[in-house]
Structures are given as C-alpha cells and as structure tokens.
C-alpha cells in the first residue's frame, strides 16, 4: 500500500533540547492514525515539520512524495488547528469563497463544501454567530478545498458537544473511505479508540508504541477485568470457584492476566447455569496510553 506520509528517523532539536528523537512512522492512503502523547511529547513539533513550518534536524520526511512545505506537498496537504479562527463579520459562504480564490479554485464550490460539512443552512450567517462546533466545520470545509490526500488535524474535536463530535468523525470516516489519509492528535482517548486504524504514542519526544488497538493490548499485556453475574443463591459458590473475585452489589469482579484469560473463561463456563451473565472488559486505550507514556518518577 502506498504511503501518503513517510517519516524516517526524525529528530528535531531546539538548541540543546531534543523535541523529537529518532521517530519513524508512515501513513497509508485511506488510513486514520491517532497521534497521542502528553503535553510536550513532540506532537505539535511533528505536525509543524510535516507542514513544512519548521525544518527537521535529522531524518527524512516525505509528504505525498514531496518535501514538506514544497509547492507539491502544500497542494495535497490540509491542516485544521485546534481553534479555527475566522473573521466574525464574514458569512460562512464568504469565508469559503475567499479561501477558494486564494487556492485558485472556483468560488462556486463554497456552498457544496458547506453542505458537505452540514452547514448549508447557515451559509448566509455571519461566522461571529457560529458555535465552536460550527466554526470547526468551517475549518474542515476549508481543509477539504482541492481534495487533499493528507489531513493533519490538531485536537479537532476540542470543545465540541457529543453530537458534533460524532458527526465530525463521520465526516472523517467518509474522507478516509475516499482514500484520504488522516493524522490527528487528541487527548479524547475514548473517541479515537473506535475511530482510528492505528495509534502512535509519543513520550518525551520518542515513539514508545505504535499499532492497532489490538496490537497495543497484546504488547502492553495488561490485565483483563471480568464482571460475573451469579444467579440467585450462587454468589458464594461461584466466588469460591474464582480465586480473587470480589463481590460488589451482587456482581463478582475479578482480573486476570492475558495468559490466564482462557483458563478463567473455562472455569466460568464450567459453572454452567449458575452464571447469569459475564462481562469482559479488555484494557481501554486510556489504560494502554498510561502504560506506555509513563515517565520517570510517575
């Protein structure tokens, strides 16, 4: 599969401070990759290098087959910052028409773009009356000008309500289905858990983990939580069969390692109809992120 973004052994220093050290990653066409890390981990620095805003100190970065910041790369890359800012006196349509002209595109595309992000009905309203979610949608519409092959999104859903977040990710899913590559940073781990194909975790400027959620779960080897619901009258008997189980509110809670999981499932299955229900809770992305991004002294 062709890579839209290729980063090889990227290092960035600011005088004696290393913001990024020996980071390698690639993003394929149609792939959605989450970029995670604590404040100061190097996420923003990586994005600035990809966009050609600052140079790398060492390593190789290729954006759509071109150098970052080159005319060819800029033509195929779109960026959406955490807080998209627009002139409050302009309408949504006027703002898009302005950007279309600047990009050498037909201004008549403004309304179709606004319709694509769900803002057609508000196209004639001034942006100063828009909510945060609506302004982010204007930013996304702007990012879609020219059919970019790579979208770089910095905390794109910050400040959005749950419905706006859901709709925003639905738009990203459609873009990825059309072949666009998406690299997004976010602190909202629960939402990227189900809406990205791969996860990259940075800590203190280094890549500490990369892979699908399933890959990271296997690598972290964190315990699995189980909630067992006993049928009436069988709680004590079931608890005796499951060492370490704790009864809380009629449920039996226990944890086991990944290697013990199948054996524990077998013991529970052996209890037959004495068990009314079983809930399996694998490690969440938040658990995995905390595991990999743990720093000295934490």
Language-model-detected regions and their locations in the chain:
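Structural motif detector for alpha-helix initiation sites
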Residues: 92, 110, 213, 282-285
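ABC transporter nucleotide-binding domains
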Residues: 5, 12-203, 209
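Short, flexible helix/strand-to-coil boundary loops that buttress conserved ligand/catalytic motifs
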Residues: 90, 217-220, 292
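Residue-level recognition of well-ordered beta-strand positions that form the cores
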Residues: 8, 26, 227-229
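ABC-family P-loop ATPase nucleotide-binding domain
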Residues: 1-11, 295-298
């Amino acid at each position: 599969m062709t890579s839209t973004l290729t980063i090889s052994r990227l290092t960035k220093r600011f005088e004696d401070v290393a913001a990024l050290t020996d980071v390698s990653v690639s993003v394929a066409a149609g792939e959605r990759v989450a970029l995670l890390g604590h404040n100061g981990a190097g996420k923003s620095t990586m994005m600035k290098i990809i966009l050609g805003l600052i140079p790398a100190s060492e390593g190789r970065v290729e954006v759509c087959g071109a150098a970052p910041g080159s005319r060819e790369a800029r033509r195929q890359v779109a960026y959406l910052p955490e807080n998209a800012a627009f002139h409050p006196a302009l309408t949504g349509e006027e703002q898009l028409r302005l950007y279309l002209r600047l990009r050498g595109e037909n201004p008549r595309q403004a309304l179709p773009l606004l319709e694509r992000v769900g803002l057609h009905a508000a196209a004639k309203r001034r942006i100063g009356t828009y909510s945060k979610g609506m302004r982010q949608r204007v930013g996304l519409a702007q990012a879609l000008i020219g059919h970019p092959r790579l979208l770089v999104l910095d905390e794109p859903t910050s400040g959005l309500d749950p419905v706006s977040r859901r709709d925003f990710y639905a738009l990203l899913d459609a873009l990825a289905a059309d072949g666009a590559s998406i690299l997004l940073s976010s602190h909202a781990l629960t939402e990227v858990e189900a809406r990205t194909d791969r996860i990259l975790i940075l800590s203190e400027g280094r890549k500490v983990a990369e892979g699908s959620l399933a890959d990271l779960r296997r690598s972290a080897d964190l315990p699995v939580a189980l909630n067992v619901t006993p049928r009436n009258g069988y709680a004590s008997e079931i608890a005796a069969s499951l060492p370490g189980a704790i009864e809380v509110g009629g449920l039996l809670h226990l944890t086991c390692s990944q290697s013990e999981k199948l054996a524990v499932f077998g013991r529970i299955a052996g209890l037959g109809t004495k068990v009314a229900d079983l809930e399996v809770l694998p490690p969440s992305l938040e658990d995995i992120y905390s595991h990999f991004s743990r720093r000295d002294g934490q």
